């Protein structure tokens, strides 16, 4: 209950940040437009975000005969929940995510790199983690926050262009260049911090829930160590193009050398592994 209340407050904060940006752009009219825009985006995220995210990563559905589907099906039956659809992303960087508005309309996507690098037990640990996200309904919260955060980043960029080309010497029209630059920097960082607060505790809960579903915390712990190392060594092009979706993945897919990674939506892999090993 406390975690759900916290998430509601943080999602409301994301929406409020979007409204504030709208107010800075267009006064009271801008605030109303931003609020309407947020409502439309939340509605769209609820119904269509899973499809959009899967298209972003060119995910292809796996057949019911694929061994990954068999693992997901067995885990879902063990957990007493609906069997999600399973998708494959053709990318050598090992990672995975879950999406969908509820367990009945959920999807789990894995990369080809994950299947190539992990053992079947480790793959099972990862899939159980993603299934736990589905059961906890984190998938809806994640995609809604990603949608709003993406909108905030887009509007912040718009702010920058308006500040550069819409400001006149008499200070009568447009956005002041200094204000535009500040918003361009502060707004995405604020959105990222809110996403971080939403996502971190839910990752720990999904780790614990996934370990219970799979029956062996060590499988996920071993997988996380391999995934963390690989994602520091490789470049996930699609994730870099859509950074607002980074928190959907089991391991942060963004390049570790980037400044934005200081505000990671994921807790440290070392802490996650330590908690899993403590479950023995």
Swiss-Prot record:
InterPro entries from the UniProt entry: HtpX_protease, Pept_M48_protease_HtpX, Peptidase_M48
NCBIfam families, alphabetized: PRK03001.1
Active site, renumbered: 130
Binding site for Zn(2+): 129, 133, 203
This protein's record includes keyword Cell inner membrane: yes
Main location: membrane
Keyword Nucleus: no
GO cellular component, one term: plasma membrane
GO molecular function terms noted in the UniProt entry: metalloendopeptidase activity; zinc ion binding
Database matches in CDD domains: M48B_HtpX_like
UniProt keyword annotations, A-Z: Cell inner membrane, Cell membrane, Hydrolase, Membrane, Metal-binding, Metalloprotease, Protease, Transmembrane, Transmembrane helix, Zinc
Entry membrane topology: Multi-pass membrane protein
Name of the protein described by the UniProt record: Protease HtpX
Localization, UniProt: Cell inner membrane
Organism per entry: Legionella pneumophila (strain Lens)
EC number: 3.4.24.-
Cofactor note: Binds 1 zinc ion per subunit.
Pfam families xrefs: Peptidase_M48
TM regions (residue ranges): 7-26, 30-49, 146-166, 178-198
Protein family per UniProt: Belongs to the peptidase M48B family.
A GO BP entry: proteolysis
Cofactor(s) needed: Zn(2+)
